[in-house]
Amino acid sequence: MSKIFVNPSAIRAGLADLEMAEETVDLIARNIEDNQAHLQGEPIEVDSLPEDMRRLQLDDTKPSGPGEIAATGESKCQEDFQMDEAEDPALLFQSYLDNVGIQIVRQMKSGERFLKIWSQTVEEIISYVTVNFPSLPGKSTEDKATQTASRELKKETVSAPSQRDSQSSKTKVAAQTASGPPALEWSTANEEDDPSVEAEIAHQIAESFSKKYKFPSRSSGIFLYNFEQLKMNLDDIVKESKNVPSVTRLAHDGSKLPLRCVLGWVALAKSKKFQLLVEPDKLNKIMQDDLNRYAFP
């Protein structure tokens, strides 16, 4: 009977691979437990669900009449958009600003320039506000004073457009003279169409067009979704993606984009099925975490 000899180096390499695999599994498990505990569960396929999700009855007691069905749906929508006192956005925002202040002090102690720190902080705060304070559909978040100011601003825009342009240019010159944060100039540059930026965004989205990402559902589980299920033209997806904070800057620098955040942003704006499936508060937290990880590593 012949003997099979195994090279000791191959055994050592195999053991090293096993150790690396175990460490990778442990790391993934810790990440899921620490940061994405709400995403645990069996994912569901969105394609297998009906277009009109409101036909599904998740309660044990079924409404008897059309009026009761309408009342139940209305109360359910109100519950979805209500937030507990423990999750008051104002308190969360105050805590976030406190952490930002601590981070600025640490960076200044390490010797970084204030203008560089401030420009990054401005973009980070704008990103946080945009993601965590979205305007709810069908509801106005403006108070009477804000509405009055908006109407007055609109009248001034219609009556004197040249005056507005002049004031805008003066403001920009004054900001440059005072050596203000350079992040203000970036917001203006974002509004301009840059073919190279659009090409970079389209390239990264196209590479992951059929890749499915996990999103939190209203049933405390998860569901899978991808760009292909949007059933949108790639140009339209790119156009909407440019509204995501920091995405245009990342594409301009050739950096990797937070595609799950981009998909969630576009789907929340364009897909009714996605709006009915996703849990808004958890989605906002996931999108903010993705933006912080990619835009401010």
Swiss-Prot record:
Residues 137-198 are annotated as: Disordered. SUPFAM superfamilies: Phosphoprotein M1, C-terminal domain. InterPro entries: PP_M1-like, PP_M1_C, RABV_P-like_C. Keywords: Chaperone, Cytoplasmic inwards viral transport, Host cytoplasm, Host nucleus, Host-virus interaction, Inhibition of host innate immune response by virus, Inhibition of host interferon signaling pathway by virus, Inhibition of host STAT1 by virus, Inhibition of host STAT2 by virus, Inhibition of host TBK1 by virus, Inhibition of host TLR pathway by virus, Interferon antiviral system evasion, Microtubular inwards viral transport, Phosphoprotein, Viral immunoevasion, Viral RNA replication, Virion, Virus entry into host cell. Pfam families: PP_M1 (PF03012). The modification Phosphoserine is found at residues 64, 162, 210, 271. Residues 138-172 are annotated as: DYNLL1 and DYNLL2 binding. Residues 159-179 have a biased composition (Polar residues). The keyword Membrane does not apply. A motif (Nuclear localization signal) lies at residues 211-214. A motif (Nuclear export signal) lies at residues 49-58. One of its GO terms (cellular component) is virion component. GO terms for molecular function: RNA-directed RNA polymerase activity. Non catalytic polymerase cofactor and regulatory protein that plays a role in viral transcription and replication. Stabilizes the RNA polymerase L to the N-RNA template and binds the soluble protein N, preventing it from encapsidating non-genomic RNA. Also inhibits host IFN-alpha and IFN-beta signaling by binding and retaining phosphorylated STAT1 in the cytoplasm or by inhibiting the DNA binding of STAT1 in the nucleus. Might be involved, through interaction with host dynein, in intracellular microtubule-dependent virus transport of incoming virus from the synapse toward the cell body. Belongs to the lyssavirus protein P family. This is Phosphoprotein. It comes from Rabies virus (strain silver-haired bat-associated) (RABV).
